[in-house]
C-alpha cells in the first residue's frame, strides 16, 4: 500500500459500510455505487475486511473479507460489510435493532507476499506480531488472521496454533511441515 487513505476516504468507507448494512438488514436493495462520486484511491481495486464488534463488550459479531483485490475498494467494503452482517457462519444474521449497538472496523489489505523459509521451527521468528497478517495454506485448506489478532494471541507459536485450528488442522501442524505462508499488512480504521 503505497498511498494511504485520507481521513475523508476513511469516513466515506465507514458511511458506505454502515448504510449497506442498514439497507441489507431492512431487506432493501443495496445501493449501486456510482464510482465517479468517489476519490481515485477508492475507485482502485482493493482488498478489505469488514469487522463488526458489539459496542457493549467489544465482542466480535461478524468479520468477512477478501485477501486479494478484485474490485474497486469502495465496492469491496460495501460487499463485505453486508457479508459480515448477514453471512458470517459463526453468528446469526445481524438484525435491524442491533445495528446501533455495533461498531464497524475496516481493514484495507496490502498485497500478500509469500514468506520463504526452510525450517518450520524458524517460522515464528519470521512473523512480526502486531504488524503482519498471516495466511496459511496446506493443499486446499486455507486460513488467515488479520494483524489485529495479535492483540489476543501475542505469542507467535500460539498465534500459529490457533491459525492451524482455524484452517481445520492440528494446532501443531505448522511444526510438522513447510506450509505455504504469506504475510500482509493492513491500514485499519473504525468508527
Model-based region annotation:
Residues 1-191:
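Basic nucleic-acid-binding interfaces
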Amino acid at each position: 500500500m503505497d498511498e494511504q487513505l485520507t481521513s475523508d476516504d476513511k469516513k466515506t468507507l465507514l458511511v458506505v459500510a454502515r448504510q449497506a448494512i442498514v439497507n441489507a438488514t431492512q431487506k432493501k436493495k443495496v445501493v449501486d455505487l456510482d464510482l465517479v462520486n468517489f476519490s481515485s484511491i477508492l475507485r482502485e481495486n482493493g482488498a478489505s475486511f469488514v469487522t463488526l464488534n458489539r459496542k457493549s463488550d467489544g465482542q466480535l459479531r461478524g468479520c468477512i473479507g477478501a485477501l486479494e483485490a478484485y474490485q474497486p475498494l469502495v465496492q469491496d467494503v460495501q460487499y463485505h460489510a453486508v457479508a459480515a452482517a448477514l453471512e458470517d457462519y459463526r453468528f446469526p444474521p445481524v438484525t435491524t435493532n442491533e445495528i446501533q449497538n455495533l461498531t464497524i472496523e475496516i481493514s484495507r489489505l496490502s498485497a500478500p507476499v509469500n514468506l520463504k523459509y526452510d525450517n518450520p521451527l524458524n517460522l515464528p521468528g519470521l512473523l512480526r506480531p502486531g504488524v503482519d497478517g498471516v495466511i496459511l495454506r496446506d493443499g486446499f485448506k486455507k486460513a488467515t488472521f488479520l494483524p489485529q489478532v495479535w492483540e489476543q494471541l501475542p505469542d507467535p507459536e500460539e498465534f500459529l496454533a490457533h491459525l492451524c485450528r482455524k484452517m481445520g488442522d492440528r494446532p501443531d501442524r505448522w511444526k510438522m511441515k513447510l506450509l505455504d505462508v504469506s504475510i500482509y499488512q493492513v491500514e485499519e480504521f473504525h468508527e
